[in-house]
């Protein structure tokens, strides 16, 4: 990568052409000598007329030409009367508009800012400024000055301007004092710096911080890392090795630090089968409250009723179907007990059973709500039931606090307006979302949960579906009979063979499951691209963007998503003068690209056919419809929702011609292409292969190594995931 020469430039702001108040990204014109310079980067709030000294480097933009990329921004207040007027007229101080700015500067000239700060009573000499307004003007000016002083102080600690903005938003005017005393506070909730970054900032401080802060932050960092790997808790003894390595200390010190964190309530301890486990408090609360809510439903079940055989017979006749014994059992359980987990693999009739339950609920006059974890899963649920379905977030009427944490309007104090709720794709739901969902259920509400326990666990923390089934306390019906029509599909047959640990049939032709063998990762990647771009569209009329999805076990390697996305972008959406593009890191985003959101962003606004809303979530797939280089905004269609985002939000996207199996969960696609070659051992599990295979509705093509496909089908090991929901469901109530 080319290394740019770092330089410093200074000048007066002529105009701020773009500024994002959320993250500080700014584009401005700077008068530096006789030159008008475009400067871009993360900067604090700025106004025309301010004097800046910028550190950074020159860069060349394909559309806008030469720009100065800002890494550090220092600024001074304007000194000349002309610059002061421009600053005030641009809204530099709250309460002063352009006309009032002229009056003030005409009267006080170069002394204007000094008077605003130190002698604001004199402002009341000007018509239109009352003594009270003069005080407000001065207070706002001083607040801005304080903010800038804080930014300067923080930059001395090696923090970038973007980091300073984040710290100030979290800590306010006390930011510099807090960080000087305890830089590891930056790792806390609402700030989110990595432990390693806090270590570097700590090294820049004039005095080393208390080592206790560092030890506690390090232990919490290890706990958070476990959380990101899906664990809700961790055995205490498992903490010693990573903590001693990270902190370069001994086990006794780690042990003492853990006790301190437990004593202060920042960790929670619970013994499970005579083994001590550690939890972060909010996860402990989520698992325990979920178990308590489920036990409450079991103790005081919804008012069920006897389900007569003739009612089920009537549904069969109405829909022209015949239920199997297990399907009838599931319907009876849902009606009579009001609580059910319905599970089973593809082709076992989960959807048919679900529709029968739904029709009987409605026949009883119940108001039924349908929900799923993702937008695509909710859309599919709506299609197969013929009724509206929402994401769990929308069902709970989510709002977001200043730290981007979900706050649900529907909760125990304001429960859902429903008498029955059906929740699909339960295997994808993590424990924190499940806890919020259960909290919002009204007393007496019937609950049917649907999922496939053989799929991968959720990306987030917890193992909700598995733990509830394993507890044995929740009514479960597992559909095992594969219906004849479904068995005509080799996708369905092979999915069930994989679940049983049997090798899938790979040599059958003229079906819906195909295998193209190669032992070369390079050839496999090229084959995948050709299948998506040419062969499947030609044979079946599929759209490469809308109907075909490449699903990879891993990101890395020749057949990982990173490389295949580059290959397929070059094939399906090559550079063209009519397609504006921009580069973020190593990724080119071009008009027409298929993209995916990689983290929850609760602030993105969107419009759709059913109304407007906010929030685009991790795993949402869309098409980049327009890249506007002038406004630095991008338009993306996520299914039927149109979102317009600033360029800086593109860093939360990645190309989605190929996605990982984990990211594909909850989605189904008409055609799936899956390269299986060189899969890392940590991912070469049966449930990963099974989850990928069951994403395909009509056509599946596996490309790669026959021996690896067979070995994955035989490998029933699963990545160990520590969770406690089963324990809390089984533990005696106090």
Residues of each region from the PLM?
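Accessory, non-ATPase domains that flank or precede helicase/AAA+ motor cores in DNA-metabolism machines
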Residues: 1-310, 733
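Loop/turn positions that initiate beta-strands
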Residues: 49-51, 592, 619
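ASCE P-loop NTPase helicase motor core
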Residues: 233, 328-331, 336-509
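Conserved pre-motif I regulatory segment
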Residues: 311-338
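Conserved helicase motor core of P-loop NTPases
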Residues: 453-614
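C-terminal accessory regions
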Residues: 500, 609, 618-734
């Amino acid at each position: 990568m080319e290394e740019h020469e770092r330089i410093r430039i200074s000048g007066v702001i002529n105009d701020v052409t773009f500024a994002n108040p959320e993250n500080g990204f700014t584009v401005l014109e700077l008068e530096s000598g006789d030159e008008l310079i475009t400067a871009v980067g993360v900067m604090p709030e700025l106004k025309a007329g301010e004097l800046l000294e910028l550190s950074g480097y020159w860069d060349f933009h394909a559309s806008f030409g030469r720009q100065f990329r800002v890494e550090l921004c220092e600024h001074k207040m304007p000194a000349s009367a002309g610059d002061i007027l421009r600053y005030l007229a641009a809204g530099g101080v709250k309460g002063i508009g352009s006309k009032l700015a002229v009056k003030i500067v005409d009267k006080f000239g170069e002394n204007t800012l000094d008077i605003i700060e130190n002698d604001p009573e004199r402002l009341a000499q000007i018509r239109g400024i009352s003594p009270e307004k003069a005080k407000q003007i001065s207070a706002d000016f001083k607040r801005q000055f304080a903010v800038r002083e804080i930014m300067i102080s923080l930059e001395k600690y090696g923090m970038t301007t973007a980091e300073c903005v984040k710290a100030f938003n979290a800590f306010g005017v006390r930011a510099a004092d807090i960080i000087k005393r305890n830089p590891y506070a930056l790792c806390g909730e609402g700030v989110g710096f990595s432990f390693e970054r806090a270590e570097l900032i700590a090294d820049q401080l004039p005095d080393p911080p208390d080592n206790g802060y560092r030890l506690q932050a390090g232990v919490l960092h290890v706990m958070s890392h476990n959380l990101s790997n899906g664990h809700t808790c961790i055995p205490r003894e498992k903490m010693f090795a990573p903590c001693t390595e990270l902190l370069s200390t001994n086990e006794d010190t780690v042990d003492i630090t853990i006790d301190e964190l437990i004593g202060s309530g920042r960790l929670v301890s619970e013994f499970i089968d005579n083994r001590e486990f550690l939890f972060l408090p909010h996860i402990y609360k989520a698992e325990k409250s979920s178990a308590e809510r489920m036990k409450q439903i079991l103790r005081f079940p919804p008012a069920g009723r006897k389900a007569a055989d003739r009612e089920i017979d009537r549904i069969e006749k109405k829909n022209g179907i015949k239920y199997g014994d297990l399907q009838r059992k599931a319907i009876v359980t849902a009606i009579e007990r009001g609580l059910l987990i319905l599970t089973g693999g593809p082709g076992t009739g989960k959807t048919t059973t679900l529709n029968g339950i739904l029709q009987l609920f409605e026949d009883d006059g119940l108001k039924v709500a349908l929900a799923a974890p993702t937008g695509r899963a909710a859309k599919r649920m709506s299609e197969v039931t013929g009724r509206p379905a929402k994401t769990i977030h929308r069902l709970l009427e989510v709002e977001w606090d200043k730290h981007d944490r979900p706050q649900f309007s529907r909760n125990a104090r304001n429960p859902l307006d429903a008498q029955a709720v059906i929740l699909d794709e339960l295997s994808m739901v993590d424990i924190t979302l499940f806890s919020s969902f259960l909290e919002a259920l009204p007393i007496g509400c019937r609950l049917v949960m649907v999922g496939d326990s053989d799929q991968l666990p959720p990306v987030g923390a917890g193992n909700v579906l598995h733990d509830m089934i394993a507890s044995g306390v929740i009514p479960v019906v597992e559909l095992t009979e594969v219906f004849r029509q479904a068995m005509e599909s080799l996708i369905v047959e092979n999915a069930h063979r994989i679940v049983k640990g049997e090798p899938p049939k790979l040599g059958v032709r003229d079906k819906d499951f195909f295998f193209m063998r190669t032992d070369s990762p390079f050839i496999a990647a090229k084959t995948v691209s050709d299948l998506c771009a040419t062969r499947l569209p030609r044979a079946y009329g599929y759209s490469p963007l809308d109907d075909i999805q490449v699903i990879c076990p891993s990101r890395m390697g020749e057949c990982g998503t990173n490389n295949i996305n580059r290959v397929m972008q070059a094939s399906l959406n090559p550079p063209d003068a009519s397609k504006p593009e921009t580069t973020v890191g190593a990724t080119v985003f071009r008009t027409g690209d298929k993209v995916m959101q990689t983290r929850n962003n609760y602030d993105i606004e969107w419009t759709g056919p059913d109304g407007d809303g906010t929030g685009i979530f991790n795993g949402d797939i869309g098409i980049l419809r327009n890249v506007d280089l002038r406004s630095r905004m991008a338009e993306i269609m996520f299914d039927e929702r149109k979102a317009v985002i600033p360029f800086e939000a593109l860093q939360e996207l990645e190309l989605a011609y190929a996605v990982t199996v984990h990211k594909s969960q909850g989605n189904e696609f008409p055609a799936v292409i899956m390269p299986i070659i060189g899969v890392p051992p940590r991912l070469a599990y049966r449930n990963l292969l099974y989850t990928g295979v069951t994403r395909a509705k009509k056509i599946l093509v596996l490309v790669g190594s026959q021996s690896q496909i067979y070995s994955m089908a035989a490998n029933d090991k699963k990545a160990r995931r520590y969770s406690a929901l089963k324990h809390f469901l089984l533990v005696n109530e106090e």
